[in-house]
Amino acid sequence: MPARKTAELLLQVGRLVQAEGYDGELSPAQWMALRFFARANPFSRTPSAFAEFQATTRGTATQTIKALEAGGYLVRQPFKTDGRSVSLRLTSKGKKALARDPFEVLVRAVDSLDATERTAMRRALHQVL
């Protein structure tokens, strides 16, 4: 398969995933934040860690976090050892939202590949990225 065709297929996958991310309730950035805070260890659930993970500014990350807090998906808690720092955790509403995460469409598609295909795909994508 020519490189251009492969690149077009990757672009199409990206568009499909992006389109799935707009569910009318949360934006793709907000979905990414929910996934991050659900997986991160308690000491990494900070605005700075999320900004670094997203490779964005702290201001942009904070806007996403504030929207999720306002929507009742995240709650902010001060660290017991340092009251100036905060840890963010998912609320029950945030956990319920993740149960219907549109990203799972892609996860299921990749899961439909056999182990050899998934390994080859992962290696190829690592090389591309």
Predicted regions and their residues:
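Short, hydrophobic-biased segments on the C-terminal half of alpha helices
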Residues: 47, 65-66
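N-terminal helix-turn-helix DNA-binding core of bacterial DNA-binding proteins
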Residues: 15-57
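N-terminal leader segment of winged-helix/HTH proteins
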Residues: 1-28, 71, 90
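Amphipathic alpha-helical segments that line or abut small-molecule/effector binding pockets
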Residues: 7-11, 119-126
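Charged, amphipathic alpha-helical coiled-coil/dimerization segments
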Residues: 66-119, 123
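Pre-recognition alpha-helix immediately N-terminal to the DNA-recognition helix
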Residues: 5, 12, 32-36, 96
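Alpha-helical linker/hinge and terminal dimerization helices associated
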Residues: 10-13, 17-20, 54, 97, ...
